[in-house]
A protein has these predicted regions:
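Multi-pass alpha-helical transmembrane bundles in non-GPCR membrane proteins
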Residues: 1-176
Length: 177
């Protein structure tokens, strides 16, 4: 729940900046980021707040898994629509790729899920690492400090996926979150 509030607070700061500089692409990218992040946090909080016997548990688990795709695609949106927009086709190709994965992943997640899907985890990791195909244009487009933050985000996504894949280890799901 704290992540929802913090994310919304910082998101409003980013949106305020976008409106001040009158950059429609930045506003759209940050809006997608906020929708993905808040959607993911709300889905996860709702799912984990329910008792295991709740009739809503399975539906919310599907929403929780689908929302991870939105979070990843949303995280890429400002990068692709702002930073990589002037770097040839890289921004649009990466934007199309991650949102196509998010739509496909959402459809897949809304079907009956196994308790733990390796294909789903690999898809999350693949989406998270997809920026590597445009790493050189990214280095050209943004400051090194921005690249460091993007790398840190990728490391967090991959680390989360590793912890998630250790589902048989005690407390691994708690560490994942």
């Amino acid at each position: 729940a704290a992540g929802i509030l913090l994310g919304m607070a910082f998101g409003m700061v980013f949106l305020y900046w976008c409106f001040r500089v009158k950059d429609g692409w930045a506003t759209f990218g940050v809006s997608l980021y906020l929708l993905g992040m808040v959607g993911s946090y709300v889905a996860s909080t709702s799912y984990h707040a329910l008792r295991p016997t709740s009739p809503w548990k399975e539906r919310l688990r599907k929403w929780d898994h689908a929302a991870i795709y939105w979070h990843i695609a949303g995280s890429y949106s400002p990068i692709t629509l702002v930073a990589l927009r002037g770097e040839g086709p890289w921004g649009w190709l990466l934007f199309a790729f991650v949102w196509t994965c998010a739509i496909g992943g959402t459809i897949s997640s809304l079907r009956k899920l196994k308790p733990h899907s390796n294909i789903e985890t690999l898809t999350y990791v693949g989406m998270g690492l997809s920026v590597l195909v445009a790493f050189k244009p990214l280095l050209h487009a943004v400051e090194v400090s921005s690249v460091a933050w993007i790398i840190a985000e990728g490391v967090m996504f991959v680390t989360g996926a590793v912890f998630y894949s250790l589902h048989r280890r005690r407390y691994s799901h708690t560490v994942f979150h």
